[in-house]
Structure formats: C-alpha cells, structure tokens
C-alpha cells in the first residue's frame, strides 16, 4: 500500500504538470487564435468569458458524476479530452469550429480541475501531512513549460496546429500512462480513517469562507495575468519587452513558493501559512501600486507570487478535510467540486473589475482593490485550522502510514 500511495502521488503530480502545460499554451496564444479565426475585438471577450463559465458548469457536473464514477476514472477520461480540445482550437478554419473547441475545452477543464483536486485532497488525507502545495507546484512548472513552448512557437512562426498537435501527441500518452497509478478515495480512506459522518451533504455555511477566499485569490491572480504587462508599460513607462517579464517572474516565484510551501504547513500549520501568504501578497500589491518605476513594480509582482501561491492549494485542502471529517470521502469530493467553481468566479470578476476601476480612476488605485480582497482572507484564516491530531504545527497523525 505504501508503494501505491507513492505512485499515486507521483502520477497525480504528472497530471497537474500536463494541465499546466496545456492551459498555458491556450492562454498565451490567444492573439494567434484571434488572428486565425478573425475574431473581432468586440467578440473576443465573449469567447474568453465562455471558457471559465463552461468550466464552472463542468465542475458542477463533476459533483454529480463522481457519485457514480470514481474521480480516478473521470480524470483518466477528461485529461486526454482537454488535450484534444486544445488541438481542435488550433486546427479549425471556421469560427464555429473554434467556438465548439473552446466550449469542449471549458467543460472538460472544469471536470479536470475538480477531479485532480479531489484526488489531491484524498491523497493528502491518506498521507496525514501536507502535500497539496506540491501538486500545484507541478502545475506551475507545467505553466512555465507551456509558456516557453508558446514563445518558441511565436518566435519560429509556427501555426497553432503545428504547435498544439505535436504537444498533444506527447502529452496524451504521458497522461494515459500516469493515469494507471492514480489512487482513489477508497485507499485514502483505508489509510487515514473514516469521516465522522457517513454520507450527508455539505452545508453552504461550512464552505462559504473557503469560497470567498478562493474567489479573492483568483481575483488577485487574474489581476497579475491580465494587467501586469499593461500596468508596467502604461503606468510605469517600461519598454514593451520589459513589460512581458512580470508574469514570467510571477510564475517562477509561484513555483518556488509552492515547492517549499508544504514544509511550511507541516512546521507552522495551515492557518499561519495562509495568513502569511495573504500579508505577503497584500504587501506585493502595495509595492506595485506605489512603484516609482518598472523595476520596483517587478519586485512587487515577484512578492505577489510568493504570497498568493499558497492560498489556493490550502483552500482546497482545508475544505476537503473539513467535509471529510464531518461526512466522509464522497461529501469531500462534492465540496471540492463546488469550491472549484469559485476559482472561475474570481477569474471572471478580477480582470473586468480592475479594468473598470483603472479606466474610471487610475491603475494604481485599481491595484489596491485586489489588495483589500486578499487582506480579507485574514478574516477567514481560522477556518483553515484542522483537528489537533491532524497535520500542522509539528504534528502528523500517528495512524498515517509512512509513505516517504
């Protein structure tokens, strides 16, 4: 059983990595998609908004599907489908083909995100210590790899089909092979005990703090991904080349923060790590908003990555843990699926919110809005506390198997 858990952990990390590559390849080549299909500037926001909306629908559907199908089975099916949807988006010739491909991408990526995090929470429960940040570190690493591939494609003027096709040819077999070692909730339950309640349903009151924190974190994240380049160039008067750097630096610091974040949770506990992350992220927004020049602004975005990176993985972990302790594994899966919707809510709200405030006032002031929302995370930080016999603050469950 120890070997199965280790294999399950490694295979799930591969799945997170693959998804990071695929998602980065899509979002970094949006201008090329617009050119390929002749999407007007007026219509482009509709296409961009449709993906997270449909991803939310996919996440809601996943909550119902996992009542009949194990998350491991669902993940094995949807990850290749996401890769194929990416290829479809880059290979069509008519606008409706792009719409169908992006719709398929949105629906399947919602199921993929939900099922990956379900398995991550289940494995963390089986391990009896924090490992969730490591999975999200693999996603960040995949995002860096995908963005690098996108740069190569743009530099060498590769068509989207020539970029996406070979990438999918490599990633789909990797995902399929990794899926052989996924570990489902039954093994997690065997290793970590059974929840206090058998069945039941998760109350919205329990999930509300985590839903708000998830939305706040993704509002901050979407601010960086959508507005960092424009802010550096238009407000801080950087060069066009330098304006492309902040998001890459943000991704690297996100990777580094997540790579060591689990150690912080084991040593200091989830509450302390979430509070620290919120304070650091808020400090990053302050530096960005008050920056005197582009290099100071880049320091702010760097600090932002170190702060925001720990919040989302810990939100999934805490919500899943609380649901499991009260109702068992199946309700934990439902909680993750519902919570996952709010990452898309944050993504949808963040970009237009900052843009509207920036246009109506100024972009320095607009950067203070996600700062305030991230600071609001401090109000809900105690919700991340586990039971005394759970991991955190130097403790691991005595009954947890030693899985390395």
Question: Which sequence ranges carry the predicted segments?
Answer:
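Short amphipathic helix-loop junctions that connect adjacent transmembrane helices
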Residues: 28-42, 226-242
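Helix-breaking motifs and short loop linkers at transmembrane-helix boundaries and internal kinks
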Residues: 38, 70, 91-96, 237, ...
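Conserved MFS/SLC helix-loop-helix module at the cytosolic interface between two early adjacent transmembrane helices
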Residues: 57-92, 96
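Helix-to-loop junctions at the C-terminal end of transmembrane segments
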Residues: 58-71, 154, 257-270, 358-359
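Structural signature of the two symmetry-related core transmembrane helices
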Residues: 73-87, 272-287
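Cytoplasmic helix-loop-helix junction between adjacent transmembrane helices
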Residues: 102-137
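Intracellular juxtamembrane helix-capping segments at the cytosolic ends
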Residues: 111-125, 310-327
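Helix-loop-helix hairpin linking two adjacent transmembrane segments in secondary transporters
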Residues: 135-183
